[in-house]
Amino acid sequence: MSGELNGNDTSVQAAVSAGSVLEGAAFADEGEQHNESMKTLVLGALGVVYGDIGTSPIYAFREALHAAATNGILARSDILGVVSFIFWALTLVVTVKYVLFVLRADNNGEGGILSLMALVRGALKGRPDLILGVGICGAALFFGDAVITPAISVLSAMEGLEIVAPNLTPFVVPATVVILVTLFSVQKLGTGRVAIVFGPIMALWFVALGASGLWHIFDDPTVMAALNPYYAVRFLTVSPAVAFVTVGAVFLAMTGAEALYADLGHFGRKPIVRAWLWIVFPCLLLNYFGQAAFILSHGEAAALPFFQMIPSFALWPMVLLATAATVIASQAVITGAYSVARQAVQLNILPRLEIQHTSEKLHGQIYIPRVNLLLGLAVVILVLGFEKSSNLAAAYGIAVTGNMLVTTVLLYIVMTRIWNWRVSRALPIILGFLVIDMLFFSANIIKVHEGGWASIGIATVLVLIMWTWVRGTRHLFQKTRKAEVPLDLIVEQMAKRPPTIVPGTAVFLTGDPKSAPTALMHSLKHYKVLHENNVILTVVTASKPWVALADRARVSQYNERFMLVTLTFGYMQQPNIPRALGLCRRLGWKFDIMTTSFFLSRRSLKASVHSGMPLWQDKLFILLARTASDATEYFQIPTGRVVEIGTQVNI
């Protein structure tokens, strides 16, 4: 479905109608080609993809041990069980599920939950709303993750001050707020100039993780016995109730795994996989096993083991490096939130948002002021409300486990409908993933009262907003379509009663090229004039991320006065109507911006009891429509060439 471009409401009714064996399997059918060197891409992936999961050792092992302790006492079997569980969870969830399977499910090279949703909907007849609903839930959970990640990451790093200088403990929360406010304040300047150091800093961070862990493994080398899954299984079976609660905390070691897929379009599969197998996975394991060995030999150190196992002379540098790493992790999540928000707008899941480009060279570097403001406020409120990273842990797990569960469900459809796998082949794999996902999700969902309510609350509000927008735009489209007049009939009437012809070209934007655009009807009714050349323009968003320039425009001559033009953009592309119309020159229409006027409809919406939606949802939709960014700016049309015609619509 395509969309009419209006001033206050809908813009686009979107047409979404460890080692070589693993690596070899992951790269089967590999088709990516990169101009940059592999080393550069791997380094870049360290700075963007792995910031979140790379900072998990600061708090994940600590939280898991707290959950596993019985009356504050940890047995040796508990410590080995927890670290064994972390090892096998990272192996099965990240290395097997994401590296071997999910990264293959790209949508023309792009990843992320909305890309996966668009891919699945495009493969199913009728583009079922159930898949749209699943995608909306996944996107809402991602935004919930984007709120929690900066809060828990930076807060956990600043808690290192409690070890370095206990007298600075009261300043942990204020310092965290200052760092986060600064981070969100500088977003409008762009990250291009500083992003170049993200990779090297994160590389140094992973080296520090691995080195500190390796050093302390020698405190108790027997910790390596935890590589045996026996310890994980024994931990789960000896005390199931305690183990079940601990599973929720263990999942914190997996947070950030979804970034492997979300950032697929930025780096490609090969650099992401190589960074994981060669650097990230080994360094994470060394650190987790090092923390376990340190606690086995220093039982009293379970409070903040990550910082407590650092030598005193290296504490300050480690706190500073941890702070830098968590800021980078937060930056990656913020950038991801911008990207998902843009996709949601293009897929007509959210209203139009003002999108600013912060780099002339890199089109993907964008800044969305409204998303930045709401995200920043939510993050600061979480920090002030929860005060400690341990209090945020419960909220964190629900968002990420929910997102992973959605990914698994959509992956099954990709396997059976796109890869054409037999159900007998796909189902056992998916069931295995679902068992793991459900185990983690159920272990986290029981923590609603401990802070999980924050994650659920954020996701619920966002689902409500997105579904209201989808439902409202559909009702509006159907209602206005009933009142529209077929273009054939208007042309026939004009042939009988010709209006006054004025020079120039008029472009009328519409969601249905078979109907006369509202702006055209008002122009004929009130001014009784028709331009010499008239273009009925439809903008369509494809279910793939990128549309080649050769496929951007379709032009057909309706009659001597009217021309039909369809512009198609991918959901990762920012529509630029004047530039796209310039491509029509090679199709026979000599577009000249200086002699062209763009006619847009600006609708004033009013709630109605007959809309088909509850009155409260009508009012919410109207509020969302009023806050949508201006169509002229969104589609990058010169303001001096735009004529807006207002209409009132009861929905």
From Swiss-Prot:
Q: Could you tell me what reaction this enzyme catalyses? A: K(+)(in) + H(+)(in) = K(+)(out) + H(+)(out)
Q: How does it sit in the membrane?
A: Multi-pass membrane protein
Its predominant location is: membrane
Q: Where in the cell is it found?
A: Cell inner membrane
Report the transmembrane regions from the record.
41-61, 82-102, 130-150, 163-183, 194-214, 235-255, 276-296, 309-329, 366-386, 395-415, 426-446, 450-470
Keyword terms: Cell inner membrane, Cell membrane, Ion transport, Membrane, Potassium, Potassium transport, Symport, Transmembrane, Transmembrane helix, Transport
Q: List the disulfide bonds.
A: none
Query: One Pfam family of this protein, by short name?
Result: K_trans_C
Query: Can you supply one Gene Ontology CC term for this chain's record?
Result: plasma membrane
Q: Which InterPro entries match?
A: K+_transporter (IPR003855), K_trans_C (IPR053952), K_trans_N (IPR053951), Kup (IPR023051)
Please list the GO terms describing molecular function.
Answer: potassium ion transmembrane transporter activity; symporter activity
Enumerate the HAMAP family for this protein: Kup
- Give the family per the record: Belongs to the HAK/KUP transporter (TC 2.A.72) family.
Biological role stated in the UniProt entry = Transport of potassium into the cell. Likely operates as a K(+):H(+) symporter.
Query: What's the name of the protein?
Result: Probable potassium transport system protein Kup
